[in-house]
Amino acid sequence: MSETSPAPEPAIRFACLLSDRAALAVSGPEAAHFLNNLLTAEIEGLAVGAGVPAALLTPQGKVIADMLVFNASDDEPLYLIDVAAGLAEDLARRLMLYRLRSAVTIDRLGPEVGIAVIAGHPAPEGEAHYRFDDPRDAAMGARLIGPRAELAALIPADQATDEAAYHAARISRGLPECGKDFLAQSAFPHEVNLDQLGGVAFRKGCYIGQEVVSRMEHRGTARTRTMIVEMLNGFNVMGGAECRAGDRVLGIGGECAGARGLVPMRIDRLAEALAAGEAIALGGVPVRVIRPDYARFPVDMG
């Protein structure tokens, strides 16, 4: 069973600190140029106060780490990177390796620096933290980066939610994150919809893995795309479960929240299964497959 977009959703509301995210700071006169030469997104043209999804790739074009990059420049260039906490150390190490003689400073900000997310409520103002709109989806509200203790105090008790509310909203909007919905170095940017979310610049110069990604784009060879799946019986499934149609494996699911999950799946096999009227299941649980609202890639949903 499938449909091209989710049924109408209640308004997205969450307000919490994210324990599974960390921040890096890249500063210095050549910070924008340095990041632009490494990451998939256009960084040099990023306006102050704006953000963009991006990824660092292997030379073979696989995602090492996805991230949100924010231009926090004031008098001096400063870019803040919002990344999965489990990937932060490795990302910082890799950026340091590429720094060479570039006039940049790379800091892995410590646990005293937190990232909070707020949607459905006005984001609190303050001088000790940075506030950015989520560049992937306006419905996902704002992200605040600053002292963890201050951010915790800024969230009113009557608005506070747990992190599960954020992840349920993220999944319902079709926004995959490395480490939760796919493993590092397992997927190309197209396979996790980074190109659909504005995280791949196809008109800029070279970056690591650019040749593979560009070839996939211009030849239209991306057969795997990340889709939303909704458990029809309301149950959740553990991450890593196979999504199957009969004896065909469509993909491997990530973590589930709110009876939904994300699956990078073979859309050619999905189309064949739907055309044949085959039931689709994730970890043995029947699911409905939903194409994200933002998706522009072709897929025959039957």
Task: Tell what function each PLM region has.
Residues 14-25, 68-176:
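Acidic, low-complexity central loop/insert segments
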Residues 1-65, 73-74:
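Acidic, proline/glycine-enriched N-terminal capping motif
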Residues 30-35, 88-92, 123-126, 148-155, ...:
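Short, conserved charged micro-motifs
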Residues 42-43, 96-104, 155-165, 245-250, ...:
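A common structural junction motif
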Residues 192-200, 214-302:
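Glycine-rich, small/acidic residue-mixed loop/short-helix segments
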Residues 55-60, 118-128, 233-246:
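Short amphipathic alpha-helix segments
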Residues 163, 169-195, 232:
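Short, conserved active-site entrance elements at the starts or edges of catalytic domains
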